[in-house]
Regions:
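Amphipathic alpha-helical repeat scaffolds of TPR domains
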Residues: 134, 138-162, 183-205, 234-248
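Secondary-structure boundary elements
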Residues: 1-54
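Helix-turn-helix repeat elements of alpha-solenoid scaffolds
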Residues: 125-133, 160-174
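Terminal, low-structured helical/coil segments at or just beyond the last alpha-helical repeat
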Residues: 215-250
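Alpha-helical solenoid repeat scaffolds, predominantly canonical TPR units
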Residues: 172-173, 180, 190, 217-224
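Hydrophobic/aromatic-rich core segments of domains that either
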Residues: 66-134
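Active-site neighborhood of thiol-dependent amide/isopeptide-bond enzymes
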Residues: 34-91
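Short coil/linker segments at helix-helix boundaries
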Residues: 97, 201-228
Length: 250
C-alpha cells in the first residue's frame, strides 16, 4: 500500500525506496518507529543476542550487521534487489541505481545513520585500499550464496563467543564458508585460529613433537596468512579502531 500510495511503482527501484523509508522515517507501517542504531554494547560483548536480527524486529534498533541483514530479509520477501556489502568491521546495503537518482552506479544504504552514502566515504572513512576493493574483500555486493556463506563465519564467531573455544565446529563452518566465499576475511581469520587450536591440541596429545600432522597444520595456517596479504587485507590499526568507535559514539 505504501508503494502505491506514494507512486513508487513507477520506479524500477520502488521497492527499495519504500524499504529505505520504512527504516528511516516514522510511518504507520513501522508503528511510527524508525529503525535506529543501538549505541549500547555495540559489539555485543555484554549480550551477544544484541547482534541478532530478531532483536531488530522486536525493538527497531540494532547494529551495523543486524540492520542490513533485516533489510535484506525484507527485500527478499518483497522481491526487491538488494545486496549485503562489507567494509572493515561494518556491513551495509547496496542496490543498483537503475533509476539514476544518484551519481554512482550503486546506491549505498547506510542504515546506521539513515543516509544514502557515496562510495568514497567508505574508502576514506574505513581506510580501504584499492587492492582490497579490486580483490572484492570490501564494497562488493555479495551474491545470495556468498551472503549465506558469510553467515557460516558469523555462526562460527557466535559459537566462539558462547563457548570461548575454537574447535572442529568452527573449523568446519569456516572451511565451508570459504568454499563458497573464498575471499571472506572473517572466515579466513577464524579458520586460522581454529587451526592454531587444532595444532595446540595435537601437540599436547603427542608430547609436543613435530610430525606430519603439525607440519600440515602449520602449512595450512601459512597459506591462509599469505592469502589474506595477497587479497589486500590488513589488520585494523588502533587508530582506525578508535576513530570508528568515536564515530559510533558521536
Amino acid at each position: 500500500r505504501f508503494i502505491v500510495a506514494n507512486g513508487l511503482e513507477r520506479y524500477k527501484t520502488g521497492k527499495n525506496l519504500a524499504l529505505t523509508e520504512y527504516f528511516f522515517r516514522p510511518y504507520s507501517g513501522n508503528g511510527h518507529k524508525p529503525f535506529t542504531y543501538d549505541f549500547d554494547d555495540t559489539g555485543g560483548q555484554a549480550d551477544f543476542t544484541k547482534q541478532f536480527v530478531t532483536k531488530v524486529m522486536q525493538t527497531h534498533s540494532g547494529q551495523c550487521r543486524s540492520l542490513p541483514m533485516y533489510y535484506k530479509v525484507l527485500a527478499e520477501t518483497l522481491g526487491a534487489e538488494a545486496y549485503i556489502a562489507y567494509a572493515p568491521a561494518h556491513v551495509f546495503i547496496r542496490y543498483r541505481n537503475e533509476d539514476k537518482m544518484y551519481p554512482e552506479e550503486w546506491v549505498n544504504v547506510e542504515l546506521t545513520t539513515h543516509q544514502i552514502t557515496p562510495e568514497f566515504f567508505y574508502k576514506e572513512h574505513f581506510e580501504i585500499s584499492d587492492k582490497a576493493i579490486e580483490n572484492k574483500i570490501y564494497l562488493t555486493p555479495l551474491t545470495d550464496r556468498e551472503t549465506v556463506a558469510a553467515q557460516l563465519a558469523d555462526l562460527a564467531f557466535g559459537y566462539w563467543n558462547k563457548f570461548k573455544c575454537y574447535d572442529e565446529f568452527t573449523r568446519c563452518c569456516t572451511e565451508k564458508s570459504l568454499e563458497y566465499y573464498p575471499q571472506h576475511p572473517k572466515a579466513c581469520i577464524i579458520l586460522g585460529k581454529s587451526l592454531d587450536a587444532a595444532l595446540v591440541k595435537h601437540l599436547k596429545e603427542n608430547g609436543y613433537k613435530e610430525d606430519a600432522c603439525t607440519r600440515q597444520i602449520e602449512a595450512q595456517s601459512a597459506t591462509l596468512y599469505e592469502k589474506l596479504k595477497a587479497l589486500g587485507w590488513e589488520d585494523m590499526s588502533e587508530e582506525l579502531h578508535d576513530k570508528l568507535e568515536k564515530g559510533n559514539q558521536e
